[in-house]
Structures are given as C-alpha cells and as structure tokens.
C-alpha cells in the first residue's frame, strides 16, 4: 500500500527517509525552503550511500510549509527547537486521521500524554513553551520515533548517509495500532530496520542518556567522545550526570537495561567523534539544549528530584550558546 507522506525538514535525516520511501512506491512531499527547496523542485533528492553509490528520487514533490496540503503521515525531522514556531502550520498539514511522526532528539513534548500516573497529560514548558505543539499538532496524532542513523546534507538536494538504517517507532500508549503497523511495514519495505516498541519512552531514554551527557560536555570542552571518556575528570562528570538522569527516569518508570559504565564504554568506542552540539557551536547555531538537558531538569523538578550536576552543566552551556549567538559566529579550537 502506498502512503501519502510529508517530510517537514528536508535535511539529512529527512532526505534519507524521503528518498528511500519514495523509491519504494510512496508519495513523498518534502517541506523545505531556500536553496534546498529550489534544488529538490528542479532535480529531486539524491542520497549518497556508504559504498559510494547513489540513489536518486526524481519524482518527489517539494513546497513550502504554507503551500502544503494535508497528508496521511507527517514526519517532523527538524530539530526540537524548530518545531514550536511552525506548530500551527504543521497542524494544517493534518486531516482527521493524520499521524505525526516525531523524530527529534531528547524528551518529546508529548511525554506525559496518557501516561498513567500522577503526571498524566502534564505539559513540558522547556520544549513546548506556550503549549503550541500540544495545541496545534495534538498529542493524539503522535507516533514516537528514535533515530539511530547518521547522515549529512552535503549540498542542496543531496544527502550523504554516514551509517545506520534503524528507526524505532512506537505509540505513546504502547499499542501496536494499525497506523504504526502500516508505517513500519512501509519503512521495512523501503529498506529500513523498523521495530515497533511497546515502550517508546524507555527507548527514547536509551539514546537520550548519552546525548544529555556527552553533547553539552563536548560543547563546553571542544573534546571528542573519545577524549571525554579517556580523561578521568570528564569521564567521572559524565557518570555523575548519567546517574542523576537515571534517578529521574526510574522515578517515571523507565527501565535502564545497561549500566552507566557500559553506556560510557559505548561512547568511547565511537572514537574521535564530534557531537552534534559541538558542531553547532563551531558553526554558530542554536543548540538542542532544552530537548536534551533542560527537559530532563524539568522532569526532575516535577518529580522533586534534585539534579545539581545537570543544572550546572546546563547553565554553562546555555551561557556559551548565548555568547556564540550574540557574536554571530561559531567558536572552534581547530
């Protein structure tokens, strides 16, 4: 069955998804802007693979968010802080049965939607200020997703895959609904590994656990994952941050299936990799700090769990971001 899909944010991950979904027979529309929009409208989207070969999707559609019409599935592939400003326009991409797939890093804005317990339907101000996403997109539309691949937009309309093809999907309720099953089947047919999780929040925390630690520490120190893990003081800092976050997560029912030491060892094994947050500092871009760290601090406040180390790292990283944005240029030690 062919799906009618809009991809909001035709960057690295959005382009990767869109090319493969289009080539497997789905109707894909990229919501883009600027030179990227012009390139896709003129030439389609190209995906350069790890082995040096390329895939080209010439027949995809592309338009601005204000020109787009409703679709059956709407993929949100931009960064977390970029969603709220266009939440109202995203809402206009939806008909009564549209599913919205959230692919952002960090704690999602819909985290407490229908989550059984004392915090059910609590809204998170750190990642959805003013409740724009809750109001205009609606948590009932959401399918959660965890993104594992790495890719790069190397030119307008051209994406390079670095590695990976796994996207885990899950309903906030944990049910294997018709809509999530149909989407998973379409993604598998397109060549992705797409398990459907019955506990998407715990799946999100597995990735978040590393991101909330290594991203801000790398931004502050300009160190790679390998450097952070090999230096005793920053390795200990990472362990302390992860322990504070684990306490918050477990209070909310999250199950951590590996130890802190194993999670750090996994990051160390990645090697001399610059995190996305460090790359954003180097290029003078806004950070995903609220989604990755501010949201976890907010969860701690809600649960009455202190997070002193997370608070300190957040404060320093927030000031660094403000300084970089105020000066209008990136900061690099290379």
Where in this protein do the model-derived segments appear?
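Rossmann-like NAD(P)(H) cofactor-binding subdomain of soluble oxidoreductases
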Residues: 54-154
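Nucleotide donor/acceptor-binding cores
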Residues: 3-4, 72, 165
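Conserved beta-strand termini and adjacent loop/short-helix elements that scaffold enzyme active sites
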Residues: 31, 50, 63-65, 145-147, ...
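NAD(P)-dependent Rossmann-like dehydrogenase/reductase catalytic/cofactor-binding core
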Residues: 2-3, 227, 235-334
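Short, hinge-like loop/turn segments at secondary-structure boundaries
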Residues: 46-49, 117-120, 159-162, 213-214, ...
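NAD(P)+-binding Rossmann beta1-loop-alpha1 motif at the extreme N-terminus of oxidoreductases
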Residues: 1-50
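Internal alpha-helical scaffold of NAD(P)-dependent oxidoreductase catalytic cores
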Residues: 39, 93, 134-207, 213, ...
